[in-house]
């Protein structure tokens, strides 16, 4: 803290001014526990000449210590470590000389370090004792009549202490204590005891050898004058480095003012004498240690002082401490209740403001003078509109650079009953064999109890405190639809709305209706074929018992049924052929990566560790397998989702092939690539792979080793030397063939070596054959939506080609993950759609597709980078030089991330794919928009992601609006809460525009200076005007103020007139024909003033600007409102001001509420817990309307008079003798207008326990039912037609050949009977009957 010089301000006295105030007692504060100081004194064995041999003693006041330190002139002189812990030690000085003279202090060692130093002992030239230390202790409150102790501390034993007072030649008191300190007591303090005191000492045996006098000490008796006031300007809370002025003001002129800080009275004590009745103590550059409680007082020339001022707490901080907000009685309240939001923070003397998320202006204010332990923000008679997230902020009336931190928030929910929770299943909604499912019911606020319901069983109900319910599937009884609800502690009798239903399925997995229908048709066809075969055999062997008519009818029925089934199968096949094929991608768990590390580069096999890393962020466990048998399991070692498997020294027992898997929830990933350890001195052979070979294009071959920092070589079969060779590049290397030709075909392999042993090569990899084949052109590949997606999103890949009837393959990072059969599309095109229903963190990567027809393949498509966001923190996006760019100029968008070595992408709102990509080694990337035009205007954002692990990306940055224009858009100026402000209140003028990151300037008409808000990073700039007065009213405008050089034109905002009210008598406001009118009618609001020649202003509650102004010739203004609408409803008032003093307005008129309605809107009616009566249970009907202050009525069909009235809209219905069943409706009326009733609600039907049960009626059920009906009807028609034909057939057969038919039946009965000769008449007749056809 710096203070001005005495001529300019306050100066700190070198004397100690002591006030007899029990400061901490008067403040009600707890004394600060300070570390006790050690005591330092002198001893000498030469009483006549003590400076001949001096020893300094240092004593710890409260504990023993192992080390003591002696300081001289603030530098270390010597330190002593005694042989055992002790309270005191001695430092031998010897004879006092010029070199020994100086300031001495001592310290002792404690657990936390060195203690505070002792009081200063000054050794001066020989022949004079060091001056004592002098201070005062107050034992009682600082008022006349209290007792005071004056303490004088010397440096030798058995000294004589003398107390002197200014103006007296003789000492007023003396003492000879046994120690080194004397205590002088002044009892019953009076004003005569005021004055300046000093203390001196001398040795008893040398009475003429006096010490130097102590520092003078002023004794001021308080309470003779009234207490002053202490204020801080600009405010009591400031940032380090800012200036502060503490003003102490009293009622008497010409006094001396004193300022002190309670925490350090000796070092923070300042005096200032002025000719006025106030003194300013100026802090030029505040420091953190200036924080504390400050007091001031004043005294006259006779040291008669005033009472202490009130305590003023000064905060010096660069960041405000957080406020906390608490809702009482609960954050979940019912409609119509009152809620208090209690906001508290550690900073005193500052106002508080209550904000609601989504609203710019504060809802309520608490002035600093009105805040105490019982003060809160109140929300009375809450409605649905009060639901939201609230926060509390400090309300500063002065300007400071202190940063505002994030604040504690409270989410207030206003419900007729608590909102529904969320219900999820872990690990999935499908039962696995022998496994249970945990249903998790969750809500964001404290809950008393959760309840789980099972829709298939009405009596089923489980309760849980933590919301977890374990469901087993014993005998298949766990499947079904579940929902949950909860109740809170403040309303234990009210259960919340039910959650969305969640269906649990059996181990068979997910079944679609198409699959069920196809399988049912196939099974029916097989059954029909078997049945037809049995009928034929039955007729063949058992026809003796069956008449021909019955057999024929049965066969006909079977044939017709088969005909319908075959037709249905053909229709399904044709439909499937016409539709474009869409294949759901069952994403495998990402394949992990396996490699080896060692800390012995020259002999890596001496200590080898295998590492397994998964690209997924949800890996629970890793498994390492050797030769597919033995395994070791371990958990991830860090957030990088990798695990170590130490093998130690490699021996023969370690040789083999290693794989690793990652375990996620209930799924195991594919195995990693094999790592084969073949010996103790042989490196494992690497793995070689390549992308598809295309003639004339670049080809990359990937060689993957197993250790870090390896060198690589590429070999081609038939050549002795390596084709390409790379130095130590890592665990993998890429060899490039610039242009693939016929000469490049052949078998390739690669080898590796360690960096320290470049001549020790590994085994060669397995050979890879490169063959150039004739190929179709590459397909067109894209995503239907943006390739930058959030977890859980739905992604569809579209792979298309002009060729027809092709099969498609989808690749991820070069590996095949899905395929599609030939697509029977319309002529001229063929396509396949690959679908990821819910994207996970591990699904990111580079996707591509190919198509093929028999042995001919296409070239790979261009890759699509799928980036899954929300894994890393979001970056920041800035525009350089600024977000407003002149057409034809360039702008740089810098995306600043958190991690280094990432890949950045720039996105524009409305664009399907990212605009630009950048891979950088640092943590930021610059995107250049060159020669921008109007089409480049829009919102931009950016992300960063890692390319080595499934393209896991960050959150999207905050959008940045780029304007390409030659003129800044016009900002908008408005006042909050209104441009009509009462005298003495606060108002904020907001300059808001669409351009972000630009400062604003506020202009007032008639003034040359402007108020500026620099560096605004939000949409708006705030210009607060506190304690508004007549000088604040007038016309205002604002404009942008960019902090970069630009030729873009700047245009001013609208003009805002700021009116100050409370300077004239209030007017009256009336409505003609009345305060309630029907929509479309006309209304006139009449504002009657007290003075002529006035301008009248009409105001509406919630509007920030006046609705209309009029300058009538008389005392009244008529505001005509033609064809009013519903939005004209509200609370109106008016003011007026004189032409001679514009903007100095009257008080507000009394408020007038206007209703524009012919009939209030109809309410809603619902039933709780359901619309079905259960045994012994009542139903509560809840009628809710949009307007407050109403009375509800419930009506029951069949009853002439209304059944019940209610103010809260709840009606309890019982079902005694079945009288509660039926249709209900409700309506309401306004209490202010009891003759106007609303429209009735939609009817609601209550049914009994045996009432109709709702059946699921889906499109699939309708289709299947219709198909069955058609088949049965058609079969019935065919059978009826055939039955009608049979009598004619029978008659015709009897008339023509009845005898032959009888013979045929008899011979059919004798068929196969033994003993019948082949050439007998019977057999002959039989052969004849078989050859004759039966007429039909």
Curated annotation (Swiss-Prot):
Q: List where the protein spans the membrane.
A: 519-539, 560-580
- Give expression by tissue: Highly expressed in pancreas, testis and fetal liver. Moderately expressed in heart, prostate and small intestine. Expressed at very low levels in brain, thymus, ovary, colon, fetal lung and fetal kidney. Expressed in muscle. Isoform 3 is expressed in pituitary gland.
Which residues carry a glycan?
53, 338, 374, 381, 607, 747, 798, 846, 939, 986, 1027, 1082, 1147, 1223
Per the UniProt entry, the signal peptide is 1-28
Q: Does the keyword NAD apply?
A: no
Alphabetized Gene3D superfamilies for the sequence: Immunoglobulins
InterPro entries recorded: Ig-like_dom, Ig-like_dom_sf, Ig-like_fold, Ig-like_Receptors_ImmuneReg, Ig_sub, Ig_sub2
Q: Which UniProt keywords apply?
A: Congenital hypothyroidism, Disease variant, Disulfide bond, Glycoprotein, Immunoglobulin domain, Membrane, Receptor, Repeat, Secreted, Signal, Transmembrane, Transmembrane helix
Topological domain spans for side Cytoplasmic: 540-559
In this UniProt entry, which residues form the Extracellular topological domain(s)? Answer: 29-518, 581-1336
Domain spans labelled Ig-like C2-type = 38-122, 137-222, 226-312, 321-408, 419-500, 589-677, 686-760, 777-869, 873-958, 965-1060, 1065-1150, 1161-1242
Described purpose of this protein according to its UniProt entry: Seems to be a coreceptor in inhibin signaling, but seems not to be a high-affinity inhibin receptor. Antagonizes activin A signaling in the presence or absence of inhibin B. Necessary to mediate a specific antagonistic effect of inhibin B on activin-stimulated transcription.
Q: Which PANTHER family match?
A: MHC CLASS I NK CELL RECEPTOR, OSTEOCLAST-ASSOCIATED IMMUNOGLOBULIN-LIKE RECEPTOR
Q: Could you describe the subunit structure of this protein?
A: Interacts with INHA. In PubMed:12385827 does not interact with INHA; standard receptor binding assay. Interacts with ACVR1B; the interaction appears to be ligand-dependent as it is diminished by inhibin B and activin A. Interacts with ACVR2A, ACVR2B, ACVRL1 and BMPR1B. Interacts with HECTD1.
Q: What is this protein called?
A: Immunoglobulin superfamily member 1
